[in-house]
Structures are given as structure tokens and as C-alpha cells.
Amino acid sequence: MDIQATTGKGFLHKSAEFVSPGHPDRTADGISALVVETHVRHNPAAHVAAETLLTSKGPIIMAGEITSAYHISPDGYKALARDYIRGLGWTKDFGYDPDKIEILVLYNSQSTDIAQGVEKGRKKIGAGDQGITTGYAIRKHWLPFNEDDLMPLPLVLARNTLFGIDQLRRTSKIGKVLKPDMKSEFIISYNSRG
């Protein structure tokens, strides 16, 4: 998230935050992506609109519309979510036990209205009402400058700080006390001279 504000005295304050993979927002996105990837890997013609809702204390709600020749039982979806959460480093000691967290699975078949709008017989004619938009910076060796020069400084600092802390959490003793849910925020004040 990037926020910009002025104080009216010639200063501009730019703020950016970055969250770790264990933060509820990214955990929910990761579980949804895993459901989509699992279906598409086994059935490339699958239609999957998977959503996940969770908080830092639970429960987890997995819902959406799925039409796929590959069947996953409700317990199978729960296992995907539990394994994903466990892989992020969540444990009973951190208060988010992957084996005990309540998970509610509410997937239905894709709406026939949407199916009629995207298929004609076996021929696909559209993508339905779902889409993904992604924005990111990429590294190009031929650029005459560092790609971080293209990103807002508060975002670069928030991202790099959290990457470093998360790496320490995964590889050192600090991981025994530092939970996977982390957020960093930087606020940079600029004056008229920059």
C-alpha cells in the first residue's frame, strides 16, 4: 500500500507498507492460488473462482465456484490449506495451529449463466467474469540503472526490510519467537528540495 499526504508547509509524506507471506492477506491469497493451481494442473479446462477469508485467529473460509473434472473433497481442500499454513511456519506455539484451525469449505459448481457465456459446446469463447491483474517491477540487465530506482523509496525500504527479517525468521533461532505474520511500514518526508 502506498499513501501520500502533504502537511501544507512544503513537506510531502510518502508511506508504504509490505506484509510477509504469513500475514492474513497474503495467506488467504496463497490458499486461493493453491486451489486454482491444483485444479488447473490436473484439469487444464477447469473453471475455478476460489476465494479465502481468514483472520489471525481463525476460522478459515474457503468459498467460490469450481467446475472441474478433477475432484477434491472438502477434506482435501482442508488439507491443502493446512499444509500451506504449516509451510509458512505457523505452529501451535504461535497460536495458529494448522492441525486445529477450523476450516469451512463452501465451494459450489460454476453458475450455469457464466458457463453459457464462456462456452459454446466444447469450444471456449470467453473468460467469464474472473480476471487477475498483476503489477510488478522486473530486473532487466540492460537498464542503465537499478530497478529499485523506479520504485517509490518507502516501498523499497518496507519490502527489503521485511524480506531480510523473514529470511532471518526462516533460517535462525529468532524464528522460534518471531511469528510468520509481519508488516513493515516506512514514512519518508520530502521537502521542496527533495
Q: Where are each of the predicted segments found?
A:
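Conserved acidic
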Residues: 23, 27, 73, 153
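Short, conserved charged micro-motifs
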Residues: 69-77, 145
